Amino acid sequence: PGAEHIYIGFPNRYVQERHPVASHAYPGVNDALFMASRDGVTWTRYLEAWVRPGLDQRNWTERNNYPIWGLMETAETEWSLLISEHYRQPDAPCRWRRLSLRPHGFVALHGEHAGGTCTTKPFTFGGRDLRLNFSTSAAGSVQVALLREDGAPIPGFGTADMPPLYGDQLDAPVAWSGGD
């Protein structure tokens, strides 16, 4: 929702050699990954699990944690994804669980206490306002600098020219003392 130029997917990963619930008759455990593409041909697949089995031991068996339906916008500030759980469990029926997600928060930087930097590939900004979707801890923050091709900040648009942003916002404007 809201970024139709980006394709996303949630492939399931099956690890057959793991059998964490010995009483379950079948080997293997599943989780789900996240992948994205801008053209539908070249994909980036993130190998860290995006949907994990969690604390419920009945989900640490094969054929669980499958995303069932595509991403759904369930509120202005929430997206939802349905996954399967309790597959082939003698004491519980198979069911769907709804996961609640932050809009556009799949691949994100974190404004952590220790700080850090991230430099994007060069791009031409064609808009009027630069806006961020971010979430920080109480001690963390986010700042943005506009850089020249040589990596130096454009005067008036460096991190020293803007107050740190902190909090939790889905569409926050970025402003520098050198202009907007």
Task: Give the residues covered by each predicted segment.
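Carbohydrate-active catalytic/glycan-binding domains of CAZyme proteins
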Residues: 1-180
